[in-house]
Regions:
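N-terminal Rossmann-like FAD-binding beta1-loop-alpha1 element of flavoenzymes
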Residues: 3-29
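Predominantly flavin-linked oxidoreductase catalytic cores and closely associated redox partners
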Residues: 110, 117-244
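Short beta-strand-to-turn element immediately C-terminal to the catalytic PLP-Schiff-base lysine
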Residues: 42, 50-52, 148-149, 187
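Residue-level detector of alpha-helix initiation sites
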Residues: 7, 11-12, 35, 170-172
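Redox-cofactor binding/interface segments in oxidoreductases and associated redox assembly factors
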Residues: 8, 42, 166-167
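Glycine-rich FAD pyrophosphate-binding loop
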Residues: 22-45
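Helix-loop-beta segment of a Rossmann-like dinucleotide-binding subdomain
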Residues: 65-73, 87-116, 161-163, 167-175
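Glycine-rich active-site loop/strand segments that organize a redox cofactor
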Residues: 47-95
Length: 245
């Protein structure tokens, strides 16, 4: 008898988890938004920067601390496998300057469409949108199911399962659904949650020249971060200077 697995969150990670688990198990993919891939839709300014075509060392050198943590996952499914996965799902890709990989169409909706195609092809996967997970049920250290609330009728119902995959993302963009729910559930199931801190932050610059350039998007900008004589970072890329209200 096939195992029953619940995947919470239908972003890129959740959809990939459902597709993989669906090869050998019955999967219920639950999304609280009315559609899948809401954050994926806006990434890369709507173009969806899928991955980078660089060597493994490029990835590991970009991880500020504890890059060894990424070794097993990266070598199990590296960037080339990601690209092959999407192209086989009818989402052709292109490589731009700096090794950045985008869909040929420049539309993130094509990446989402590739995931949806693979989900729809697999009869072992059921997708449930507009449904919010309220609780992960545990007994004697074992996950036994989830409690959900469907938006349409506001009624709570329990769903039994053998395992739960939490793919709810962080808490960086609440408007897309990343509200930090996964941390709360993990803690209640016995995991230790460390204090969170943002990994992507804006720079506030005092110089008047930056204020004069508000609203511009610049290409091939070199960034050097130094403290005293020590240089911490050198990077080149696109620089966006938002307009302050």
């Amino acid at each position: 008898m096939a195992k029953k697995i619940v995947v919470i969150g239908a972003g890129a990670a959740g959809m990939m988890a459902a597709i993989t688990a669906g090869k050998t198990a019955d999967v219920l993919l639950i999304e609280k938004n009315d559609r899948v891939g809401k954050k994926l839709f806006i990434t890369g300014k709507g173009r969806c920067n899928v991955t980078n075509a660089g060597d493994a060392d490029v990835f590991f050198n970009s991880v500020v601390t504890n890059s060894k943590f990424m070794y097993s996952s990266f070598y199990s499914f590296d960037n080339n496998m990601v690209m092959d996965f999407l192209e086989k799902a009818s989402c052709p890709l292109k490589v731009e300057r700096g090794g950045r990989v985008f869909p040929v169409s420049d539309h993130s909706s094509d990446v989402i469409g590739a995931f949806k195609t693979l989900i729809n092809r697999n009869h072992n996967i059921k997708l449930l949108t507009d449904s919010k997970v309220l609780q992960i049920k545990c007994e004697d250290g074992q996950v036994t199911g989830v409690v959900i609330q469907e938006k349409e009728n506001k009624k709570n119902r329990e769903i039994d399962c053998d395992a739960v995959i939490v793919a709810t993302g962080g808490m960086s963009y609440p408007l897309t659904g990343s509200t930090g729910d996964g941390y709360k559930w993990a803690e209640k199931c016995g995991h230790t949650i460390k204090e969170l801190s943002p990994s992507l932050v804006p720079f506030e610059i005092e110089e008047k020249c930056c204020r004069d350039m508000m609203g511009l998007s610049l290409k091939n900008v070199d960034l050097h971060i130094k403290c005293g004589k020590k240089k911490y970072l050198m990077s080149r890329g696109r620089c966006c200077l938002p307009t302050l209200e």
